[in-house]
Amino acid sequence: APCMTLMAAFKPQAEIDKDTRVNETSDLSWIAYNSGKPGREDSVDAWLAQASVEWSAARVNQDKAKSEQEMQVLLCEALSLDPADMLHSAFHSWLYARIVYPLGVPYLVDETQSLYLGGDWCLGARVESAFLSGTSIAKSILRR
């Protein structure tokens, strides 16, 4: 399934809640504060937003500049930020970014338990699913 992503940098906002927001029923299903990582400069507030599968799919053939502009508006609304405070944005779209029907188990293993297959496609559509899959493989190997 497609995924459209916006990175946006704003003038620093002291009063804003910088927690990650996850809402699968929203047009922006995932919003994360990206400036809070160690070693990041604090002269801007950088945010990363991913649109929902439905929102992205509806705009697959739309001009990317228009999709970026629409995401900018959605992000500013979600964060209660003034669009005039946006210093920079970058947009990217992946046509095949998210697994629609995950496998439902953390990994596959051959009969000899010498070959393991894992990844986000096993459990879900996000990097967290890949991490959980890999962790499950490691635990299985360590139990042997």
Regions found by a protein language model. Name each.
Residues A1-M4:
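Glycine-rich beta-alpha-beta "Rossmann" dinucleotide-binding loop(s) and their flanking helix/strand
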Residues M7-R59, K66, E70-L79:
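Active-site substrate-recognition segment that forms the wall
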Residues W47-L48, V105-A138:
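Short FAD-binding loop at a beta-strand-to-alpha-helix junction that anchors the flavin cofactor
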Residues A57-A58, A97-V100, G124-R126:
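Short active-site-adjacent structural elements
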Residues V60-D63, E128-S129:
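Short, solvent-exposed loop/turn segments at secondary-structure boundaries
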Residues Q69-Q113:
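Flavin (FAD/FMN) cofactor-binding core of flavoprotein oxidoreductases
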Residues A84, S140-R144:
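Active-site-proximal substrate-binding core of FAD-dependent oxidoreductases
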